[in-house]
């Protein structure tokens, strides 16, 4: 189309029409052509105007073809990226409640991002719900990228692609480059910071809409704060000194890369600072907790300025670390799936300091001996956990911290390290990628896996067995591929109350006639507990009948938060001969046959699916209260049965009843007979008197 309208094309067309002219002109032109053909060819002859025109057409056509191929290549690349993003979003499988929450928080930001530019003759677009949290502020995530010098180019670009996908979903990233000053020190640190900042910038440039930019010299540091001890609210003297570039980047929907150095307010000299202090300073700034101090040039104490004006809504803080999340004692070679910081911080920190790390390797060559390596790993895990505590203290309870590895952030886990063999058709048969942990968490506000799932149920944690075989003339061996996830989601969480305290005295059956916990004790808020049960089951509890039933069998209760969730557990006596309940309990106690039983498991409707309350209750029950096992029952048509089945060792439907029985103990015919007897004979205590249906 363009070539036909060009001057070169018209000139070639006129030359091609010369033989069709008048006879006189035809004779002259033929003579000219004959004369030209009879003369020896030379470079000067080849430079005739019409030949140059033909060559111009060829060059222009080649340029257009190259441009077309480039455009098509970019289009295919863009379509592939959009497809990958769409699949990542669809694989999250959010609940209706989670999807509505994500749309409420991020739809206004997406509406601004994709607002059409220029004049449009179409009708007005439907208005998105602008009643987002924090007055419709832009939503940002502060990302700490630790030790980028140990991350290869493919993984770094994958991390950049994920950050660009988060940007497309409405979450801007502020990337803090942490070159790990414990590994690189002295004069060698500055060039490493510069180089790794450039690599992080290049990795984030993978998508055109990312528009990443480096924000150097935006951080300041108070004079004389080199030895300051940073608290949970302070940032060790580091603060945002230049706001305008950061605000402009927010308006431009740009990804920001921040190197870890700050300018002293008294000497104007730049010096390196700890990345954790930069993360805390940025968190305070965007949250509106940094206030100007005219006397010192730095930020004032937050208690002097109670009014806060946030610049953005910080939804997530992400720590991308080659080590991944903090190790968990119940997941060998794996990390905590979910951390309820109020409840689990102390125990997690204690395990970090006591655990051995023989399987982990540091990519940096700066560490030599094994003891130094273990100490370094402990320190980095402890630093990440301490930073997480400081962040969740600053931010609202809805915010969270995600700690993951570069491979999982890039969604490359399971791909690297696998040998590729050309087996024809079989070579094209691939397993599906695991869920992108960061995208899944953004949409669902949950970890990729439930923290209450047994370790063997983690799909990503099942190593493939070593296989050997022959295909064609080739012998092959597939090495075991360990794809255990090392991603941790941490939130401020809720306090956990267990009565009686199992850390003081483990739960054991109470002897007949001895004092025991009762639901009417002053330590139990019975009205709140009854409301929790009524709301969760959507039925009214017959309170007095229930109190009478569990009066002599109560083992303990678990309460999360302000009675947002909880469980009531009992010691039940099997009674195959239908003797009086007191006699059955005494006999079972003497024989050691009392059954640990989950009597009530409840979560408020408004809290169901949020904050991992059900996981917190279930974990407390099976790991702390009844570590040797527990059983319970549920109606056969209960939609929660799938959730129960995934967390139990076994289940069975009881014949001639409407109950399914679940247990977490080892299989034993004798014990399971007792379990079945208990599950069949316990009478429900509902005020509607509809228990006959069960």
Swiss-Prot record:
The keyword Transferase applies. GO terms for cellular component: mitochondrial matrix. It is found in: Mitochondrion. Residues 1-56 form a transit peptide. Residues 513-687 form the N-acetyltransferase domain. It comes from Pyricularia oryzae (strain 70-15 / ATCC MYA-4617 / FGSC 8958) (Rice blast fungus). Belongs to the acetyltransferase family. Pathway: Amino-acid biosynthesis; L-arginine biosynthesis; N(2)-acetyl-L-ornithine from L-glutamate: step 1/4. One of its GO terms (molecular function) is L-glutamate N-acetyltransferase activity. Residues 20-44 are annotated as: Disordered. It comes from the Eukaryota. The gene is ARG2. This is Amino-acid acetyltransferase, mitochondrial. It catalyses: L-glutamate + acetyl-CoA = N-acetyl-L-glutamate + CoA + H(+). InterPro entries: GlcNAc_Synth_fun, Vertebrate-like_GNAT_dom. N-acetylglutamate synthase involved in arginine biosynthesis. Pfam families: NAT (PF04768). Keywords: Acyltransferase, Amino-acid biosynthesis, Mitochondrion, Transferase, Transit peptide. The keyword Flavoprotein does not apply. Its EC number is 2.3.1.1.
């Amino acid at each position: 189309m363009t070539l036909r309208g060009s001057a070169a094309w018209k000139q070639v067309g006129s030359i091609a029409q010369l033989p069709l002219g008048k006879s006189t002109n035809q004779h002259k032109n033929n003579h000219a052509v004959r004369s030209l053909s009879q003369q020896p060819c030379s470079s000067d002859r080849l430079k005739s105007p019409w030949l140059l025109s033909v060559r111009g057409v060829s060059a222009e056509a080649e340029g257009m073809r190259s441009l077309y191929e480039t455009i098509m290549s970019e289009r295919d690349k863009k379509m592939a990226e959009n497809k990958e993003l769409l699949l990542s979003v669809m694989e999250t499988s959010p609940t209706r409640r989670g999807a509505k929450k994500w749309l409420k928080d991020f739809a206004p930001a997406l509406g601004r991002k994709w607002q059409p530019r220029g004049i449009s003759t179409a009708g007005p677009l439907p208005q998105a719900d602008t009643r987002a949290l924090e007055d419709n502020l832009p939503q940002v995530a502060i990302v700490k990228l630790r030790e980028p010098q140990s991350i290869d180019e493919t993984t770094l670009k994958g991390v950049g692609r994920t950050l660009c996908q988060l940007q497309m979903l409405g979450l801007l990233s502020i990337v803090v480059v942490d070159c790990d000053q414990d590994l690189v020190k002295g004069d060698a640190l500055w060039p490493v910071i510069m180089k790794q900042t450039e690599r992080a910038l290049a990795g984030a440039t993978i998508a055109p809409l990312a528009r990443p930019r480096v924000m150097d010299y935006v951080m300041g540091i108070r004079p004389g704060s080199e030895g300051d001890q940073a608290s949970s609210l302070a940032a060790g003297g580091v603060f945002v000194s230049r706001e305008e570039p950061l605000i402009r980047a927010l308006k431009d929907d740009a990804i920001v890369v921040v190197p870890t150095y700050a300018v002293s307010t008294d000497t104007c000299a730049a010096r390196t600072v700890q990345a954790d202090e930069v993360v805390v300073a940025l968190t305070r700034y965007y949250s509106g907790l940094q206030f100007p101090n005219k006397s010192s040039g730095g930020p004032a104490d937050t208690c002097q300025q109670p009014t806060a004006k946030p610049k953005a809504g910080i939804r997530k803080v992400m720590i991308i670390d080659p080590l991944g999340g903090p190790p968990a004692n119940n997941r060998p070679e794996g990390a905590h799936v979910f951390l309820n910081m109020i409840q689990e911080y102390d125990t997690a920190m204690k395990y970090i300091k006591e655990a051995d790390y023989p399987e982990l390797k540091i990519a940096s060559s700066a560490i030599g001996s094994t003891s130094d390596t273990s100490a370094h790993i402990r320190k980095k895990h402890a630093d990440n956990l301490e930073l997480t505590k400081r962040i969740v203290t600053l931010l609202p309870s809805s915010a969270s911290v995600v700690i993951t590895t570069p491979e999982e952030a890039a969604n490359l886990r399971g791909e690297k390290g696998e040998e590729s063999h050309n087996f024809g058709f079989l070579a094209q048969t691939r397993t599906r990628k695991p869920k992108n942990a960061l995208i899944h968490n953004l949409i669902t506000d949950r970890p990729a896996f439930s923290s209450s799932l047994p370790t063997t149920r983690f799909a990503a944690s099942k190593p493939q067995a070593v296989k050997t075989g022959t295909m064609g003339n080739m012998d092959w061996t597939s090495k075991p591929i360990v794809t255990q996830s090392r991603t941790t989601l941490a939130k401020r969480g809720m306090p956990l109350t267990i009565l009686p305290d199992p850390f003081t005295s483990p739960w054991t059956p109470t002897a007949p006639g001895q004092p025991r916990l009762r639901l009417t004790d002053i330590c139990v808020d019975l009205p709140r507990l009854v409301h929790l049960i009524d709301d969760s089951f959507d039925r009214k509890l017959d309170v007095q009948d229930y109190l009478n039933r569990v009066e002599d069998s109560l083992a303990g209760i678990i309460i999360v938060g302000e009675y947002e969730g909880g469980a009531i557990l009992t010691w039940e006596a099997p009674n195959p001969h239908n003797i009086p309940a007191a006699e059955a309990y005494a006999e079972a106690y003497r024989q050691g046959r009392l059954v640990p039983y989950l009597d009530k498991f409840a979560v408020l409707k408004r809290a169901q699916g949020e904050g991992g309350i059900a996981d917190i209750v279930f974990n407390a029950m099976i790991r702390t209260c009844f570590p040797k096992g527990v059983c319970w029952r549920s109606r056969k048509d209960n939609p929660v049965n799938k959730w129960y089945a995934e967390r139990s060792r076994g289940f069975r439907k009881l014949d001639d009843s409407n109950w399914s029985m679940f247990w977490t103990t080892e299989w034993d015919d004798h014990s399971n007979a007792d379990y079945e007897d208990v599950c069949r004979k316990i009478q429900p205590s509902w005020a509607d008197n509809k228990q006959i249906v069960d």
